[in-house]
Amino acid sequence: MIGIYSPGIWRIPHLEKFLAQPCQKLSLLRPVPQEVDAIAVWGHRPSAAKPVAIAKAAGKPVIRLEDGFVRSLDLGVNGEPPLSLVVDDYCIYYDASKPSALEKLVQDKAGNTALISQAREAMHTIVTGDLSKYNLAPAFVADESERSDIVLVVDQTFNDMSVTYGNAGPHEFAAMLEAAMAENPQAEIWVKVHPDVLEGKKTGYFAALRATQRVRLIAENVSPQSLLRHVSRVYVVTSQYGFEALLAGKPVTCFGQPWYAGWGLTDDRHPQSALLSARRGSATLEELFAAAYLRYCRYIDPQTGEVSNLFTVLQWLQLQRRHLQQRNGYLWAPGLTLWKSAILKPFLQTATNRLSFSRRCTAASACVVWGVKGEQQWRAEAQRKSLPLWRMEDGFLRSSGLGSDLLPPLSLVLDKRGIYYDATRPSDLEVLLNHSQLTLAQQMRAEKLRQRLVESKLSKYNLGADFSLPAEAKDKKIILVPGQVEDDASIKTGTVSIKSNLELLRTVRERNPHAYIIYKPHPDVLVGNRKGNIPTELIAELADYQALDADIIQCIQRADEVHTMTSLSGFEALLHGKQVHCYGLPFYAGWGLTVDEHHCPRREQKLTIADLIYQTLIVYPTYIHPTLLQPISVEEAAEYLIQTPRKPMFITRKKAGRVIRYYRKLIMFCKVRFG
């Protein structure tokens, strides 16, 4: 049992999970209960002095708590609960006067060596994912005229415990700035103000400093890694910024004695630095990281509140951060129906942006439209307002049912360059694929996702009945030809020569006269919602079998090859290890994974299936939980779809009537809007 005097500590969500023990709230006016084994306090705060004295008098050990090094999305001073804590029964990591549990962990070479590969993976994620202790700050945007020789000097909050117990104070901050200017006479000096100071909650050591010709105050709240990319050297007193600079590969000079100094990785200027180095010894950056982030810190799963690990927290923070950063500003999404605006709202609106669906907007920073059709309608107005056009479309794991039946999507994509199915220009997805360089962990994640999708038979719409091959298909090459919606934008912008289902089917038959061809009409065409029907007599002439209401994944599994114009079924077939022939230029063609009729010169890289899966399903789309209305990972979206009962498909050759479609629209709008 751990005793808690501090109301602030007592209010920390999931405290008992962090401490791995039950906790009891104590009163300063009563004796320490016998069942209490230790007293927890917050670092070296002055408020901890009395509980420490009480614990000492009662013969109870003291446990010191602090925020972990990857803490949360927003700042702690704004009330954001921690996702990570450190629990130290020796001292606390920022107290340089004596060894802490962290210092002892760093010196445990064997324990850290076992975690080196994990440390490298996490370090890579933090640097490339622009992650830090706090993760709500936007990325730093440099001026085009920026100098190349820039030195960063990091301020801290006045009387911060890490400064005091890092054997530093105002003198060290003054000496640091003086040294930075003297040692880098040709450089511009950037002074980074602490986020808590920017929020107006605290003051800093450089509060009186003013910008000069050489000194620039970085007074905006920006993410550390995005700022560090622009500097050549970093000066700190005891700030955690110094360690994050080491992760970014920058030389770091320390004027105090932070936890990462004294190991041979920093340029230490403190008068007592030799004594600290003698006590601490040497360590590599990976060993320091493994000890601090993987062993010293404790983590809570942001979604379940259960004990977790650094990688779960990093993945969640990266997901939330990417969602927020992609939607910064004042978004204007004009010309949408009530239905479309209702389903787009949770995908576009965040806690940090503004969103308008009106047909007129005067202060927007971007115009969001639905696909190519919306772009054509609003391009001129966006150009008149000098607004960038962002396109949205359905994602690749959409729903359990058809979009044309007005079922709300589980995933959408937001593309600021083009859109994935438009082969006439680059898209965000194409750029991601052209630059894909996966780490081993990312490759493993992609393969694990592929296996889960294959074993669960997930597809975009998750519709259809069981399918078995007819007996006459035995010993023949099985070719699946998926039909498409012929007036769909992917046909208009992704095809070159063959542009209709009939042309495709005829071409496949001509080139494969002895194959057993299965034609699978598009579900939207089958249910009467969209264009693309082939007369029955022509299908009978060109195909051996028509799989009407069959599950597309079961059709893929039973085929040897899939021949398509631009259908997503081709991508799904690649996941199942099938040979795919592309007669158009879908997003997955041109990377060395398909047999291609046409060439796209922009697609320069030869990809693995892991590259394609990772960028297409993990990075590019946004997944929103339909009831929580929060961003979720592709794995969580897949599990949600797996647990959702599959819907039957009602086949008709007539387009659904206007009354029926309005009725469907009303029902689904009410479900989305009012739950």
Curated annotation (Swiss-Prot):
Please name the GO terms of the biological process aspect recorded for this protein, alphabetically. Answer: polysaccharide biosynthetic process; polysaccharide transport
Q: Where in the cell is it found?
A: Cytoplasm
Q: A Pfam family in this protein?
A: Capsule_synth
The UniProt record lists the keyword Cytoplasm: yes
The protein's superkingdom reads Bacteria
One CC-aspect GO term = cytoplasm
Give UniProt keywords alphabetically.
Answer: Capsule biogenesis/degradation, Cytoplasm, Polysaccharide transport, Sugar transport, Transport
Q: Which InterPro entries match?
A: Capsule_polysaccharide_synth
Its family remark reads:
To R.meliloti lipopolysaccharide processing protein LpsZ.
This protein's name: Capsule polysaccharide export protein KpsC
Native species: Escherichia coli
